[in-house]
Amino acid sequence: SAIIKLEKSSGEIISSKTFDLGGSDAFEHIVEYQNELIAVGYNNAIDSQNTFFTEGQATISVLNKTGNLIQTKSLNEYLAQAYRIEVYNNYFFVCGLSDEANDYVLLKMDTSLNVIWSKRYGGTQSDHNFGMDIDLEGNIFLTGHTLSDTENWDTYTIKINLDGDKIWESKVGNPRGFDPKYIHDETWDVKGTNDGGCIIVAGSGDEYENYNAYCDSNGTSSNQWVVYLIKFSESGKVEWQNIYFDSEGGDWAGEAITLTNDNEAVVAVDNGSFGFLKINSF
């Protein structure tokens, strides 16, 4: 596991520290809380070459502001890979993947790292949780992708209250209208919006040598991956969905999203290196 502090304006490395938490291990996400850093991730991973689901054992760690490790606690009783952590009203909310990546898992913890409750969400097939956000009103949004009751991987987004009760869920995919059996819609991040809804970012495309189709409306091939954004209303209705792509045919996939004060979206894009996409206010 590693923690790297950067100078914000230049990107220069201020400090870098690594920690051996046991076997193949990593921090996946980190937040600040009362002059400490709280990081979640995993250790003792079986699949050390995989960065999506490593078949590891979930952990939560506390570090001081200078990056020195204070303690690490196992969360493996509840989930295999902790992927995101948020702070709300002096509680920690941790989400990630269950054993064998079958379900989304959400934990509510106190600041002494005691688990108050654990909830699972999903269907009968694989449900992979990679994104979480909590809005100012305390609405929790989880997102990722699912094979439950879908023809292939579709985006899977859930709105949850602070007691862990599901308010709504939505599965959406295949924005270009291809044969859904061949299309992967893989979601990586979510941000709550000020209207009680949320916006998710995904990548959409196919990974099959025996399938290749073209979208008449924009000329893209199913083999060309695109950035895929979906805006949900407060009640879970899809308000709009758009794709964004490389006009020269390269692959793009949305990996992370943040919202500006002007209600614009900035998306981190996997384009074979590292890119950014800015979306006008919506």
Task: Locate each region found by the language model.
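A sequence-level/structural motif corresponding to short, flexible coil/turn segments enriched
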Residues: 1-282
